[in-house]
């Protein structure tokens, strides 16, 4: 009796596998393979931030609809008089951050299309692959991000 071939129960997520590559393996990828992996990573990030922004806006809108001003108690016992407004503002701020990240991702994808992805906007040198993998929409190399080398005294 022949054994049936079993499909893996936990298929490997290609983005997760890429994120777990050793730096030596990452540096050994061809430019084309590296850019293809980065594009996949950026597109995955875009989906994540889009979903996050939509969820946070929906939660903020729900707070407004579910908590009419007449229902809010401002006594010492409830202790929740201002928390709805604070929670809503927090959700809106986080949604704004997610939307800003989407803009950064879109810019990185446009740079990829123009052939300038991975170049530091300040010094025009290549941003290390490990930094781009960690922050795929990085605009600056670490040196420029930190403001250059400190002056000696």
Model-derived segments and their meaning:
Residues 122-123, 143:
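Short, cysteine/histidine-rich loop/knuckle motifs that typically chelate Zn2+
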Residues 130-134, 151-153:
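Short Cys/His-rich "knuckle" micro-motifs
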Residues 42, 123, 132:
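Residue-level signature of catalytic and energy-coupling elements of molecular machines
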Residues 2-114, 152-153:
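Interaction interfaces in information-processing and related assembly proteins
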Residues 118-121, 139:
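Cys/His-enriched microdomains
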